[in-house]
Structures are given as C-alpha cells and as structure tokens.
Amino acid sequence: MLIINKPAGIPVHPSMQHFEDSLSNGVKYYFDSIGLKRKIRPVNRLDRNTSGIVIFAKNAYIHDRLSSLMQANLFKKEYIAVCEGFFEEKEGTISAPIARKKNSIIERCVSPLGSSAITHYNVLKEFSVDGHDMSEVHVVLETGRTHQIRVHMAYIGHPIVGDTLYGTKSDFIDRQALHAYKVEFVHPISGKLLCINCNWSE
C-alpha cells in the first residue's frame, strides 16, 4: 500500500481539466522512478478541494480486499470539518438519502429517491472570526456517497466553510474546510488493525 496526505486542489484521478496533474499521475511518476511497474489503484477517493488520506493499493489482491472492507463498512473514515454557524445539537446522526441533482453531473442533493447515507458528527469547538460564527466538527462516515459530508452539512443548515457548491465563498479560506484525517481497517494480509492519522496543519 501507498498512503498519501493529499493536499487540497489536487484531484485523485486525471480529467479533461487535470490531465497530467492528478494524484494518480504523481503516483505513476513515483512508481516509475523506483522501477515499480504497477497499475494505479486508488482505494478511497477525496474531492479535489478536500485534503487528507488517500490510499493506493500496489496489487489487485490488496485493492480487492480493501474495497470489500469499504463495501462492508469495515473501513472506518473520519474527518475534521469547519462549518458555518453554531450547532444547536452538538452531536448527532444525519440519516438522509443522497441522489444526483437533476440536470447536474456534479451536484448532489438529499432526496427520497437517493441512496442511503449516514453521517455521524460531534462539535469539537465553536469560535467566531470577524463576526462569523463557525464550528469545528468531527465527522464519521457510515456510508460513502459522493459529496456526502458536504451535502449533509448543508442540509442541516451548516455548510462547510469555503464550499462554493453547497454553501458560499469564504473570506477565510480558498477551499472547502474539510480534511480526511483518520482511517482504520484490518490489514488484509497481516490481520493487524491499522490506524492511520494525518493531522490537518492548516
């Protein structure tokens, strides 16, 4: 496995807009530089403007086993987010299905026609900057839908600071304030529980 702390602003996969500067391109360059001929296999994915832990499998077996753990909800993912406003409920669970928004290939929304999505959260800290109330929130995903944390936080009235798709532009940060700081899973070969932490330095 290759474990990377992805900076914000870098997509995991190549696209028309980021054909040569994706994280996968960087991993290929690294593999080539050490003479490792491997297919690029990201296990988990993060949005371009989300920072944090991304894991790449070095062979098909590891990729398959880790993907199976994720599908069985045995691959625990935890995040830190800074959200708009102060939460009335300091901890809770958001259970609201998510679907693709009509007429959009990118945006998602809460919809009764969507797939099950469950997000657990607890507020770590509340603070104000220049009259703007914000909350630092610890988030644990039970499911892994596209944009799940961003959609759910906006749904309860606390969009992530800097999230221009589901909230508003921020004067304090030029990206969404969301960081994947911890993953926990059982190694498919050793059977040992791995707990990987990556602090948010911003």
Where are these regions (language model features)?
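Glycine-rich, flexible loop/turn motifs
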Residues: 42, 90, 94, 106, ...
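Short small-residue beta-strand/loop micro-motif enriched in glycine and branched aliphatics
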Residues: 10-13, 106-107, 135
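A short beta-strand motif that forms part of the nucleic acid-binding face
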Residues: 8, 16, 59-60, 70-74, ...
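Histidine- and/or cysteine-centered catalytic micro-motif in compact active-site loops
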Residues: 59-60, 84-86, 99, 103, ...
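Generic recognition of long tandem-repeat/solenoid scaffolds
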Residues: 4, 94, 108, 135-137
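Short aromatic-glycine motifs in intrinsically disordered, low-complexity regions
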Residues: 104-112
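Pseudouridine synthases involved in rRNA/tRNA modification
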Residues: 112-118, 123-125, 129-136, 142, ...
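RNA pseudouridine synthases
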Residues: 1-93, 99-102, 177
